[in-house]
Regions:
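Non-catalytic accessory regions flanking glycosidase/transglycosidase catalytic cores in CAZymes
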Residues: 2, 6, 11-252, 258-267, ...
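Flexible glycine/proline-rich, aromatic-decorated loop/lid segments
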Residues: 270
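Active-site His/acidic residue clusters
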Residues: 273-290
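Extracellular loop and loop/strand-boundary signature of outer-membrane beta-barrel proteins
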Residues: 289-291, 345-346
Length: 523
């Protein structure tokens, strides 16, 4: 999670690449409000890993305390301390992987503060996010319990900035050693007879910023030292994720790789945010177009970073993990006072941004391993919002519903799409139709985003390498890009059935302005 680094830097330092690798193959110029495309069902890109739909929870504002965790004695309906309605919504969506405890918070978090009897845990100041005191009641056991409740695989971010190799090594043993060692027996004494079997371990977070302000050469040395001691226990595989660049900072990545030599990680992270110049509910058309167009350049970053790592022999086996991404709007002071730091409403514009990102991940399925949007509840581009720490209401945001529309892609084979939409001006990025497709057992799933605030589109989609007789579509749409789901109107923006027709080998539908759609095609 970004600390004091200006968030606009996250989209800087890009280098020029061929547009052909970044956008769907072109089949001619876009005309008026019509967009033509061809799904190439026999040209596979890669598997749409469920982990592309990962999430992130940090001790920040009311994400954990008051959002996910209310405590067992809370008047808020709960399941052993976890907010019941939030758990039910997250289970319904399916959360493949959840990253915790940060973010910036991770590099000041000492895991032993969060184990043992809750009343005996030390109270610590959260130095990164407001200086408030946390009671430590949500720690490792509570996080693993949440993951098990919602069906998520845990991803733990270790402390490099203020921690030590010994501390992180012990955390892994505590979590994964079945029994027999002092640390494993301590876990058992604390109520967990079975090991937690945590595979994913982040070795620091944003080490170029809030994780220690390190030069890439310095962090590479730290990573090499840590990796010597971070072993696997009890048959649980170890997947270490190194802290990666600030946005698309290719210079940082190259210096890290040049210094790394031994100690190759299984994965390397990158973070990508695009800021907003307006309050989430009061975006102008000009700023909307600018934000979404620049945000779409995450595709450049993915392609360029993957290419850079592949240029190193040892880098070809390092997975690319986009473990923080999303839109970061101008936060309203009144919202933070009422609901917590970085509390951000999600609008139809936010849903379009989510759809743009998820389409990009499908199109670049051969280059990515995991993606985690920031964050899961109450903070930035979240899935859920709650009405204050003691409030009993949880609502699903427009971003939640965008993720729901893409859920059926998980595990499918992403395939290529030819389209007549194009981003033509690299210096002044523009918006147009965004599309991706996947297939499985004869089914074709087509996802489309119309991020244009002022133009409805007619879609004409041909199929190659497959046929379809039946089609159904779901549409998430509101002509007002500032529309949101509120506590008074929690279902204002929700997916609804949408007309679609198959005419011979062509699929046709109308795609209104500011909308996200998924079309399911079957033989």
């Amino acid at each position: 999670m970004l600390g004091k680094i200006p968030r606009r830097r996250f989209v800087g330092d890009a280098v020029a690449v061929s547009l052909g690798s970044l956008v769907p193959r072109l089949v001619g110029a876009a005309t008026g409000g019509t967009r033509r495309m061809t799904v190439l069902a026999d040209e596979e890109i890669g598997t749409v890993r469920p982990e592309f739909h990962g999430h992130f929870a940090e001790h920040l504002g009311s994400c954990v305390y008051g959002g996910l965790w209310v405590g067992k004695n809370s008047p808020v309906p709960n399941i052993s301390g976890y907010r019941r309605q939030a758990v039910e919504y997250l289970k319904e969506l399916g959360i493949p992987v959840l990253r915790w405890p940060g973010g910036c918070y991770a590099d000041d978090y000492h895991w032993r503060d969060g184990i043992g009897p809750a009343e005996s845990r030390p109270k610590r100041v959260n130095i990164h996010w407001g200086g408030y005191v946390e009671d430590g009641s949500f720690g490792t056991h509570e996080f693993i319990g949440l993951c098990r409740l919602i069906g998520a695989e845990p991803y733990l971010a270790g402390n490099v900035g203020s921690g030590s190799p010994q501390e992180m090594r012990d955390w892994i043993e505590y979590c994964n050693m079945p029994s027999g060692s002092t640390l494993a027996d301590e876990r058992i004494k604390n109520g967990a007879t079975e090991p937690f079997r945590v595979r994913y371990w982040g070795v620091g977070n944003e080490t170029w910023g809030c994780g220690g302000w390190m030069r890439p050469e310095v962090y590479a040395d730290h990573y090499r030292q840590f990796s010597v001691y971070l072993r696997k226990y009890g048959g649980t595989e170890r997947f270490l994720i190194a802290s990666g660049p600030n946005g698309n900072d290719t210079r940082w990545s190259r210096k890290f790789m040049d210094t790394l030599e031994g100690g190759k990680p299984e994965g390397i992270s990158m973070h990508y945010y695009e800021g907003g110049e307006d309050h989430p509910l009061h975006f102008t058309e000009e700023h909307l177009k600018k934000q979404l167009a620049v945000f779409s350049r995450v595709e450049d970053a993915i392609v360029q970073q993957r290419s850079l790592f592949d240029s190193y022999r040892e880098g070809r086996q390092i997975a690319l993990v986009l473990d923080e991404w999303g839109v970061w709007d101008r936060i309203a002071e009144e919202d933070e006072k009422k609901f917590g730091k970085l509390w951000q409403q999600s609008t139809m514009r936010s849903a379009a941004a989510a759809g743009l990102g998820l389409n990009i991940f499908n199109r670049q399925a051969d280059k990515l391993y995991m993606c985690n949007i920031a964050q899961i509840v109450n903070v930035l581009q979240s899935l859920l919002l709650t009405d204050g720490p003691e409030g009993k209401q949880s609502i699903r945001t427009t971003t939640y519903h965008a993720f729901a529309l893409f859920k059926a892609h998980r595990g499918n084979s992403a395939v290529k799409v030819e389209t007549d939409s194009a981003i033509s001006d690299r210096e002044k990025p523009s918006l147009d139709l965004s599309v991706s497709a996947s297939t499985k057992n004869g089914l074709v799933l087509l996802s489309l985003v119309n991020p244009l605030p002022d133009e409805d589109l007619e879609i004409q989609c041909a199929l190659r390498g497959t046929t379809a007789k039946n089609a159904r579509a779901l549409l998430l749409h509101d002509p007002d890009w500032n529309a949101s789901n509120s506590f008074d109107a929690p279902d204002r923006v929700v997916p609804k059935p949408h007309p679609v027709r198959v005419e011979g080998s062509t699929v046709r539908l109308d795609l209104p302005r500011m909308s996200v759609a998924t079309v399911t095609l079957t033989p």
